[in-house]
A protein has these predicted regions:
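Bacterial N-terminal signal peptides that target proteins for export
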Residues: 1-12
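C-terminal segment of classical bacterial N-terminal signal peptides
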Residues: 16-25
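A contiguous strand-loop segment
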Residues: 27-118, 141-145, 150, 257
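Short helix/loop capping segments that flank catalytic or ligand/cofactor-binding pockets
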Residues: 55-56, 103-105, 158-161, 167-170
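A gly/proline- and charged-residue-enriched helix-loop-helix capping module
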Residues: 117-133
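Catalytic cofactor-binding cores of redox enzymes
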Residues: 141-167
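A cross-kingdom feature marking charged/low-complexity
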Residues: 163-189
Length: 294
């Protein structure tokens, strides 16, 4: 994959330092995926829309030393530049959203995952897992109260992590799946203390868009799939793509979509990220095959 000129190559050492210093942050995000009969070529597509207060996002490429894990590319986000979303050299993609239906004070007081070498769960999973199946089996990484979306060339999955580390796992090889910022499975719903209006509205909207896009035998192209993440149907604060009603309020600051072609070959990574915190016009865009020279 060619890295955009504005990208910053962040070494593993710098990422370790950032995660050790960084407190947990809430991420109001929309996650969705499509697979099999929902996709024009029968492959798999996944996406994450990242909403947060105005912040700079950085495109990074991490190539660990031999024996220390897989190479990966994606976005480091916010003040502490934690790795937030991306895809690795084996073809595993992931993103996450906070379980915002649990009060922030309580979330911050809960245990949070750090690997023995200091990595948070997104970076750890991409460094050490090659497939969705392997990522699901890496149970040690699921500690924080968050929701993960995972995808590879054969399937997509959403994992809810509840307080105490219990999980729900929903996997698809065909059809669609979506999540936002509250628990939605029967085993997890009891942990919702207060569901935000935006989370409810965005979840209903992305589910409706996915259903409409795949009804009556229809399938989605990658362009059509990406367009869902840019929907502004519900205004500045409750749309999937949020412009924000306040300059310093929550708004969409980054977007990722990944396509795994049914025929095989390299995954296609689409990224959009804000390079200047207070300037929505600073959005950078790339779309390229993910390749690593190892």
């Amino acid at each position: 994959m060619k890295i955009h000129p504005s990208a910053v190559a962040i070494t593993a050492a710098l990422i370790v330092a950032s995660v050790l210093l960084a407190p947990s942050r809430a991420h109001a995000c929309t996650l969705y995926a499509a697979a099999g009969t929902a996709v024009d070529d029968g492959g798999v597509m996944m996406s994450k829309v990242r909403d947060w207060r105005p912040s700079e996002e950085t495109l990074v490429r991490v190539t660990p030393k031999p024996g220390e894990g897989y190479a990966y590319v994606g976005l480091a986000t916010g003040k502490y530049q934690n790795f937030n979303m991306g895809v690795n050299e084996k073809g595993l993609a992931l993103g996450l959203s906070t379980a915002g239906s649990i009060p922030k004070k309580e979330r911050l007081a809960m245990p949070h995952f750090r690997s023995k070498d200091g990595f948070t769960s997104p970076a750890y999973l991409l460094r050490h897992c090659a497939t969705v199946e392997e990522a699901i089996r890496a149970t040690e990484a699921y500690v924080d109260p968050v929701n993960f979306i995972l995808a590879d060339k054969t399937e997509a999955a959403v994992i809810e992590v509840m307080p105490g580390g219990k999980r729900t796992v929903k996997r698809i090889k065909t059809g669609t799946i979506a999540h936002t910022n509250h628990y939605i499975e029967p085993e997890s719903e009891a942990f919702n203390q207060k569901i935000g209006k935006s989370s409810e509205v965005r979840l209903a909207r992305i589910k409706a868009l996915l259903a409409d896009s795949t009804s009556d035998g229809k399938t989605m192209t990658f362009d059509a799939f990406k367009a869902l993440g840019h929907d502004r149907n519900a205004g500045p604060d409750h749309s999937i793509w949020r412009t924000g009603s306040q300059p310093d309020g929550t708004q969409t600051v980054a977007y990722m979509a990944v396509k795994f072609p049914k025929a095989g070959g390299y995954p296609i990574l689409h990224l959009e990220w804000r390079t200047k915190a207070d300037d929505p016009a600073s959005l950078q865009v790339i779309e390229e095959p993910v390749t690593f020279n190892r």
